[in-house]
Amino acid sequence: LFLLKRGMIKIKKKDIIKVGSFFSGIGSPEKALQKLANENLIDGYELQFFSEINRNSIKSYCAIHNVDEALNLGDITKIKGTDLKYCDLWIGGFPCQDISCAGNMQGFDLKSNTRSSLGWEMIRLLKEIENKPKYVIFENVASITSKKFKNTLDLFKEDLKNLGYELYDDILNAADYGIPQTRKRYFLIAILNGCDSFSFPNPILTDIKIKEFLDKNISEKYYLSSDICEFNDGKIWLANKNTNKLVYEVDVEKYKKGGLCGKDHSIKFVQSTRIYSENGFAPTLTHSNLANNCKLAINVDQTMKIRKITPNEAWKLMGFDTVDYDNASKVCKETALYEQAGNSIVVNVIYYILKELLTK
């Protein structure tokens, strides 16, 4: 180690990174750090603590990363900064429900008591500790940068600057980093005292499609039954959950440019009414009813069928592998596994961010 200005200590590229994880979910940053270590880009990482309140997520996290539940500090509002071990890196993807376009849009103002306002708890903890982490990464939905939330985000960033952090932020799409999912997320990188410069990773150009992430030998329970949907002479049958199996036949030829289709355009178009090609990208996977919100048109023995994605496929579309899923599936049911995928950060995206941050 060697000293920099203001007495700060710079991390050598091969030091073991001490990590604190907030709003941990199933730990995609930890998965990304392990991948960097496996590639000998860092010596490894040491988890000092994680903070998660969802019981199922805690079980999956411990199963995936092989850590003791005693490392979980639980509710972030009950954590005292003075009790935290030193970390080189903090990471937190704080709740998006009050910021997301799919949520109630109540915002994340300080002391507003919305779930999304819990992001301010990380700043509170930064104010309470003397030996601050060199790096802090925040993640949330892209709409946090919208006009509606601009003032709050500016105040959030101003507090970080006042604590001595230099800031970098951008919106990255998982589809640009080797995952066939359209998922745009906002990342805010804070570097203490500007010891390092940082640039967000360039997109990784690939032709990867959903079909490369699909499981083999799928159970029939994931397929929509023929009384709900069928393909017939260039037309597709679409079902809406509120129609009690009543379906509408729509001439696909009229919609060659893509987009949505329905009876006289009178259906309220929501994600659950859409069918996606296996030769394209998945939509943004969310924790809410994920299985029904991502239906695929699959060629099975020269016959087109429609099915839900499996929870294992959902995990793969978030950058986790089947070993991770298998470990989590031993402690959680499918419903929880779908939710955990939808709430996660995409491993590939945070991997490339951490690679730029820690190895350049």
What are these regions (language model features)?
Residues 2-47, 67, 105, 155, ...:
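S-adenosyl-L-methionine-dependent DNA methyltransferase catalytic core
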Residues 9-133, 142-154, 161:
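Core alpha/beta nucleotide-donor-binding catalytic domains of modification enzymes
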Residues 57, 175-179:
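Short, conserved secondary-structure transition motifs
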Residues 73-74, 142, 164-176:
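Conserved S-adenosyl-L-methionine
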Residues 86, 180-185:
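A short, glycine/Asx- and small/polar-enriched loop/turn
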Residues 93, 139, 189:
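Alpha/beta-hydrolase-fold catalytic nucleophile elbow
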Residues 135-141, 331:
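Short beta-strands and strand-loop turn motifs
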